[in-house]
Amino acid sequence: MRLVFLGAPGAGKGTQAKRLVEKYGIPQISTGDLLRAAVAAGTPLGKEAKAYMDRGELVPDKVVLGMVKERLSQNDCKKGFILDGFPRNVAQAEALDKMLSEMNMPLDLALNLDVPFDDLMKRLTGRRTCKSCGQMYNVYYSPSKVEGKCDKCGGELFQRDDDKEETIRKRLEVYRAQTEPLIDYYSKKGILKSVSGTGSIDEIFNSICAILEKK
């Protein structure tokens, strides 16, 4: 089972991917993690990526694809994998398909975790963190008992700058602009499945498993 996991920031991809790893025993491959690990290990691709990052530039697709190829060549990917955070646009999807075809590992499924825009805004802008112990809350879904105070330690709750409304709105708009063509791309290939990302974690997970077990 080889799949790409699509979903906006705040859709809950990380939570669901973790549960899929536990249930099916296939690795979750995050390009962000791959980049950090390659840079830390000082691999040839890591050094190349670091040179771009040090200049404040985006790491080119060919470097990221090289890292993905190295990771997919490892034994734990033989039964399948979950690609998370890549591809982000159609050009990357086409390059990934070409590479996977050459490796004889074509994708089985592109899974889109679909959450309405307003829900994503609440999930992300509603986040609050305790300054003292790091405990997380959400003013809409899981508020603290006393507004602005941590239930665990009484510390002050704050909103991170990157959770402010304007920042989140921009992030979601960029995601939507990039990803709508990607959803169309996988739909035309006949491998796209969408799952509603609203409901309990268990309900969403059961919907995903029902799709995977039909494959």
From Swiss-Prot:
Residues the record lists as binding ATP: 10-15, 127, 199
Region ranges (NMP): 30-59
Pathway: Purine metabolism; AMP biosynthesis via salvage pathway; AMP from ADP: step 1/1
Enzyme class: transferase
Keyword Ribonucleoprotein carried by entry: no
Region of interest (LID), ranges: 126-163
Organism this protein belongs to: Thermodesulfovibrio yellowstonii (strain ATCC 51303 / DSM 11347 / YP87)
Family per similarity comment: Belongs to the adenylate kinase family.
GO biological process: AMP salvage; nucleoside diphosphate metabolic process; nucleoside monophosphate metabolic process
Catalytic reactions of this protein: AMP + ATP = 2 ADP
SUPFAM superfamilies associated with the record: P-loop containing nucleoside triphosphate hydrolases
Protein name, per record: Adenylate kinase
Main location (coarse class): cytoplasm
Reported function: Catalyzes the reversible transfer of the terminal phosphate group between ATP and AMP. Plays an important role in cellular energy homeostasis and in adenine nucleotide metabolism.
